[in-house]
């Protein structure tokens, strides 16, 4: 009887091991030429990574970021502080709470300076403090998320010129564009966009997981049913950014034991890399490592 139990346990463990799956890699385009992009990505509405480092020479890559002594990406505050009075959207979050505020760009930059007013930085976090600089207990993280390029000073917009494939692959209609800045870890929950999306990494590293429209909708609907939620699938809603819904979505998308691993595409993005996300494809994004991360994206059609 003991031998039978041992064999049964071993078989169960073997089955569990052999059925473990991993996400598939996002295909990489042969080159970054417009015809290639149209033929192999845009027209068939297929996720694709442009050749690595295609946008490494984009001005923002070198102007907005520096390398510290540990070769980690940091903000070039001397350059960016010139536009400190610009009002930007910030997300303040921790495991259980999330809120959005609008503050000056200088307020955001100060959150990455040790001992700054109302904010204190450590080497491996972007902890936000709501009281004096001698406070020692972190309360949340600060992320400049989805700041429209149209609301930024012209000089900063010029640092992230719109790529040719955005302007010429389709109708030439750029629906919107945004900047994303924050020290890892950063997080965007599972959602889908109403238009095709070109996502360019400027600094640091991000990992993206994608699901086709049918699978992604199934994941989202499953989580909403389990938690009794009613979130929008196309908005970065507050209910998706903290608490029960965030944890449930994150588990289905990112947990190694998730049943959706085999239905997932995954890519790690570094500075200069660009990912095409077709309309309707569900995706979730994480900033990883200890670097400052920076990204820009364009929604177009």
Residue spans for each PLM region:
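N-terminal chloroplast transit peptides
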Residues: 1-13
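N-terminal accessory scaffold of Fe(II)-dependent oxygenases
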Residues: 14-276, 284-301
